[in-house]
Swiss-Prot record:
Has 3 domains, the large (RuvB-L) and small ATPase (RuvB-S) domains and the C-terminal head (RuvB-H) domain. The head domain binds DNA, while the ATPase domains jointly bind ATP, ADP or are empty depending on the state of the subunit in the translocation cycle. During a single DNA translocation step the structure of each domain remains the same, but their relative positions change. Its EC number is 3.6.4.-. It is an enzyme of class 3 (hydrolase). It comes from Streptococcus equi subsp. zooepidemicus (strain MGCS10565). Gene3D superfamilies: 1.10.8.60, P-loop containing nucleotide triphosphate hydrolases, Winged helix-like DNA-binding domain superfamily/Winged helix DNA-binding domain. This is Holliday junction branch migration complex subunit RuvB. Its main location: cytoplasm. SUPFAM superfamilies: P-loop containing nucleoside triphosphate hydrolases, Winged helix' DNA-binding domain.
Amino acid sequence: MTRILDNDLIGDEGSVERTLRPQYLREYIGQDRVKDQLMIFIEAAKRREESLDHVLLFGPPGLGKTTMAFVIANELGVHLKQTSGPAIEKAGDLVAILNDLEPGDVLFIDEIHRMPMTVEEILYSAMEDFYIDIMIGAGDTSRSVHLELPPFTLIGATTRAGMLSNPLRARFGITGHMEYYQTADLTEIVERTADIFDMTIKHEAAYELARRSRGTPRIANRLLKRVRDYAQIMGDGMITTQITDKALTMLDVDQEGLDYVDQKILRTMIEVYQGGPVGLGTLSVNIAEERDTVEDMYEPYLIQKGFIMRTRTGRVVTEKAYQHLGYPYEKKH
């Protein structure tokens, strides 16, 4: 069953996000630190009539990395060509993309950490000096061909910056850490989405929905659609705080934005491992989830909310988690 609080895209959400996508930095809600930096760097590059330094955007899924890439291209007034790490399977794929770039273009590579190393190495000279050397032919007839590239800006997006090689990471002149959204910013996003799709929502209801959306716009917009359905069938169409609470409760989204999987993780740690410490691999096996899924999808929010701590000996449940789930807490010595 698809998880309502999944950070990744579900179904037709890609087309929905394109509809909601802001065009310029002034329209982009949240991520103020990244925006303020980019505003200066972009304006400086435009005044010098140069391409913008290469940009690395990293952070959990659903926080607007792809949207930010399109906004950067719009601010620069250039075209954006989009691909992803898994889609670039061999060197020839990347060469074809690079050879198709116009001066100043933005090349956006999502999930850049998933590029094969043989492909990644071609990027080094392309990013640093705007050229590539490729081998044509095989055996004794092979020869090296030098291709000059127009100045361009590479924007890489990743949820796992630690998996990037040092040589690739070092070639990004600008890095932007996309963080979980503050509730106030997320409330504004919910109200903007409701306005675009002609929904009627009370400000307090938008705040309640935002508060339980894990600091993630993608999740907030998904929940808004489900709450709208609930309001239409169980009410008069108006999205109120009461309707929002009832709808989210029906969807198993609790007051802290946790769903049944989050609670399963915490309950397992408390009931089976006495609150920890427990290793990530052991925990993953016990709850029947992939290790990477637990580490990338569930754990970051639980840590951010103060329900789990990482220690040298494993993961530990905090007193806050005990209290939230109604377990008695005894401090360990």
